[in-house]
Regions:
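Terminal targeting segments of Actinobacterial cell-envelope proteins
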Residues: 1-21, 664
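N-terminal pro-sequences and low-complexity stem/linker regions of secreted or lumenal proteins
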Residues: 428-862
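Predominantly soluble domains enriched in secretory-pathway, periplasmic, or organellar proteins
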Residues: 36-452
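Intrinsic disorder/low-complexity segments enriched in polar/small residues
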Residues: 6-11, 25, 115, 160
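Intrinsically disordered, low-complexity coil segments
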Residues: 14, 18, 171-177, 255-262, ...
């Protein structure tokens, strides 16, 4: 029965998970103070995302966050913790896009006693270890290609000379200079004698063995994207979880330092194993399977799996729990599992191999440590973002170096939750019920469905035969709709008005204004996974911050690497794969494509590529979305994107064979900052806006209009300010049934839009997140209005180019505009602001609303 706690949720005919379960046979009642009046629907109608009073929060998906225990602020994105051998020092590795750091915590008080900063390009990445005597500590350096080494004395760390991890020699290419391939050291562990370190090379599919005295190294291949390492049998064996695959590599380390370790076994576990922990006897290895939502129990004597612990929140639940970290109690009878997707810790009875309770955490727990009397939990995203009233950047006129970043990629502060052990049965039962409430498995089955039906005149969503899914780049709600005159906007933050976005703004006015819609992602790297598979897994979430901060990590998205496919089967994780499996027709225009030598665009995934228009350009700010705007900046630009789409759409108009779903990427609202010779930010947004207007006009004047819905959103909201939350973004739903002119303030997010489209075309939810999400049916009226839309030409459309004297033009010129988010996004935000508001215009001062409660009152630890 899943976690052994939650009974099967009731389901409606579409297969949507609704809110009606029991926990241990006891009905769960919604907490009015947390969820608001009116049950689940009331919560979704009136709450907003981000930090809330009392040390609680709401994630962009809509989950409530009520961390148990007392809370301590950590750094940006804590991903791992390690307890010293004597139990008196806890290390935390903070691996975010902003200031990375290594923190020392006193586990007896949960106080931070030391912080060692690592500003970019210096780096940390996941791995932490102590020598067996506790006198030396180690931290993996990720893109720095080294292991940081520290002397431990008096409860403090003193950094010593690092250990270097050799990069891989490049494959020679005649006539070229190929840089060495990166290893990107991640998880590590010391052997029992303390003489060697075993290091997982995350980007090199290998493990390096380092002699800590001489620095001598040897390397052995393992599986894809190894992440964590556990040594055993006195240092003679190492277990390596291959996060990008579904295996654990078993290494023989019995040779001396000069002997290359041997891979003696490969054990199949679940999909994308994130972490492992060995019991005290060394006979059982527990492995957290990130995209199988399970823990594999491996018999180390026989090197095979002897049991699987299901962590799903209810029977037959889709993926989304995302087990990320493990710890065993001192007596070995309890296994604690951080579930990053569900914001909880599962408490597992290791004898019965079943979940006996759940502990609510802050957002995205990644690591857990158990001492004799305390449970310590690292929460990577803490209480979330909240408003960022400056455009993702501190006030550039301020001389204070302490101004905190207001960029969504780095503004979230991680936290440490501390609870007493052992856990009392009544306490754990209350906490388990709280998790059920937080994540929507509470009483009042079908409450939100019925409320949505009432809002829609008592009818289900009209029959939609064709869906067109348009994804743009990186704008917040306030940037484009803040001055709309309706909805919850802040006019002072509106950068793109009717002069550059008349179609977007006009469609929002005449159809539906969604003023409580959030991007589930932080940036494009996880955004493109969220908009296509309703999730971004731990591989993606741990790597993109290093990629976005110049710390030598790859862009972990928009390719066919199975490591970031957030499903049990990586070949059936994306919406196009689900459509193909269900026999639904689809066509791709720009999603997950890259240019080829013949100047066509193709996807790596053969399922997607087979339905991709090769003449539709991918992301490239040199090429316009629409004709009649700016002149292409390079000769190799193909037909403007919407013009190519129109060519095929007109063919479907003639043939009558329009696919059930079209995916259309229109990226130029990303802009090219103030780069001299490139279009101004207003001109880029105008180009993008005109493309959208022309697409809507074509559909609304076609034979398909009566049963088509166009869904429009941004992949993320990272490039601007918003007075509600840094994740709030644009959403449009355009169909004859949505021309109502009303404001819909229902709590929606990316997965709500995906859920609505899935229902329309007849496929099941991909993950727990779109299964949970409220479909956007309240936006649809009873009657259809077939009046067509006529595209409006923005006044800013045309060859309005940045001059060499444009604000920050020189800095903008140093940035790469050929790939999404491959340049400094904080710089982008500042450049766009100054180009519109004036070179001397200060951005609004940041408002700090990351509300914390360090008293312990946010949770139940009594």
């Amino acid at each position: 029965m899943g976690r052994g706690q939650l009974e099967a949720p009731q389901r409606r005919r579409t297969g949507r998970v609704t809110r009606g379960v029991a926990v241990k046979g006891v009905a769960v009642l919604a907490v009015a103070g947390l969820l608001g009046a009116g049950g689940a629907f009331g919560a979704e109608r009136f709450r907003t995302a981000g930090p809330q009073p009392g040390g609680t929060s709401v994630t962009p998906v809509g989950y409530a966050v009520t961390p148990a225990g007392s809370q301590t602020d950590l750094g940006n994105l804590p991903l791992n913790m390690r307890l010293s051998p004597d139990g008196r020092m806890l290390l935390v590795s903070n691996n975010g896009q902003g200031a990375q750091s290594l923190q020392v915590i006193d586990p007896r008080t949960s106080r931070v006693t030391q912080t060692l900063p690592y500003p970019a390009p210096a780096a940390l990445f996941v791995g932490l270890a102590f020598s067996p005597d506790g006198r030396t500590a180690y931290a993996s350096g990720g893109g720095s290609e080294l292991i940081h080494r520290y002397a431990v004395a008096g409860g403090q760390l003193t950094e010593q000379a690092p250990l270097k991890v050799p990069v891989l020699a490049p494959t020679p290419v005649p006539g070229t200079t190929t840089p060495p391939a990166r290893t990107f050291p991640a998880g590590l562990d010391a052997t029992a004698d303390g003489r060697r370190l075993v290091v997982a090379n995350h980007l090199a599919d290998s493990v390096t063995l380092i002699d800590v005295k001489s620095g001598a190294t040897s390397r052995v291949p393992v599986g894809h994207a190894p992440l964590s390492v556990v040594t055993a049998e006195g240092g003679r064996t190492a277990y390596v979880t291959n996060q990008g695959a579904d295996t654990v590599s078993v290494l023989d380390l019995s040779g001396d330092a000069a002997t290359t370790p041997a891979a003696v076994a490969t054990v199949k576990v679940g999909t994308h194993p994130n972490a492992a922990v060995l019991d005290e006897r060394g006979s059982r290895l527990y492995v957290a399977n990130g995209d199988s939502d399970s823990v594999s129990v491996l018999d180390t004597g026989r090197q095979r799996v002897v049991g699987t612990i299901d962590l799903s929140p209810y029977p037959n639940a889709p993926v989304g729990t995302t087990p990320s970290g493990l710890a065993l109690s001192a007596d070995g009878r309890r296994l604690f599992v951080t579930n990053a997707g569900n914001n909880d810790v599962a408490v597992v009875d290791t004898t019965r191999r079943r979940v006996v309770g759940l502990i609510p955490t802050a957002w995205y727990p990644t690591a857990v440590v158990a001492t004799a009397d305390r449970l310590l939990i690292a929460n990577a995203k803490g209480l979330g973002a909240g408003p960022n009233d400056g455009p993702g950047y501190p006030d550039p006129t301020s001389r204070s170096p302490r101004s905190p970043a207001q960029y969504v990629g780095s503004m979230m502060t991680g936290t440490l939750s501390t609870l007493g052990l052992p856990l009392k049965s009544a306490q754990l039962a209350r906490q388990t019920r709280q998790v059920a409430v937080n994540n929507g498995y509470d009483a009042g089955a079908d409450a939100s469905d019925k409320a949505n039906a009432r809002a829609n005149g008592g009818r289900p969503m009209p029959k939609i035969k064709h869906v067109i899914y348009v994804v743009k780049e990186n704008r917040t709600y306030d940037q484009v709709l803040g001055s709309l005159g309706k909805g919850n906007g802040d006019p002072s933050l509106n950068l793109f008005g009717d002069e550059s976005a008349p179609n977007t703004r006009g469609l929002a006015k005449q159809y539906v204004t969604f003023d409580n819609f959030y991007a589930d992602a932080d940036v494009s790297a996880d955004g493109w996974d969220w908009v296509t598979q309703a999730n971004a897994n731990l591989y993606n979430q741990t790597l993109w911050p290093a990629n976005y901060s110049g710390r030598n990590a790859p862009y972990p998205s928009e390719n066919a690497d199975p490591a970031h496919a957030a499903g049990v089967d990586p070949k059936s994780s994306y919406i196009w794969q689900r459509l193909a499996n269900a026999g639904k027709s689809f066509r791709n225009y720009g999603f997950y494509v890259s240019p080829k030598p013949d100047n066509t665009f193709h996807a790596e995934d053969p399922v997607l590529d087979a339905q991709t228009d090769p003449a539709f350009m991918g992301y490239d700010m040199s090429c316009p979305d629409s004709s009649g705007t700016f002149t292409p900046l390079k000769a190799t630009c193909l037909s403007p994107r919407v013009d190519e789409w129109l060519k095929e759409f007109n063919g479907y108009e003639r043939s009558g064979k329009l696919p059930a779903m079209q995916m259309v990427r229109l990226p130029t609202d990303h802009t090219n900052n103030t780069r001299a010779g490139a279009p101004t930010p207003q001109a880029y947004v105008a180009d993008n806006d005109l493309a959208l207007g022309r697409l809507v006009e074509a559909v609304s004047k076609s034979r398909y209009w009566a049963d088509t819905a166009i869904f429009v959103t941004e992949d993320d909201a990272q490039n601007g300010p918003d007075h509600v939350d840094a994740h709030r973004t644009l959403a449009l739903v355009i169909s004859p049934y949505t021309r109502t002119g009303k404001v819909d303030s229902t709590f929606y997010s990316t997965v709500s839009m995906l859920r609505t489209m899935e229902d329309a075309v007849g496929i099941a939810p991909m993950t727990q997140f779109d299964a949970y999400a409220t479909p956007m049916v309240a936006a649809f009226g009873r009657k259809k209005d077939l009046r067509p839309w006529t595209a409006i030409r923005p006044a800013a459309a045309g060859n309005q180019l940045n001059a060499a004297t444009a604000p920050m033009a020189a800095l903008s010129a140093t940035q790469n505009s050929g790939t999404a988010d491959s340049f400094n996004e904080k710089l982008s935000n500042e450049a766009i602001w100054k180009s519109i508001k004036g070179a001397d215009s200060p951005m609004p001062h940041p408002r700090h609303q990351l509300l914390k409660d360090t008293s312990g009152s946010a949770g139940d630890d009594k």
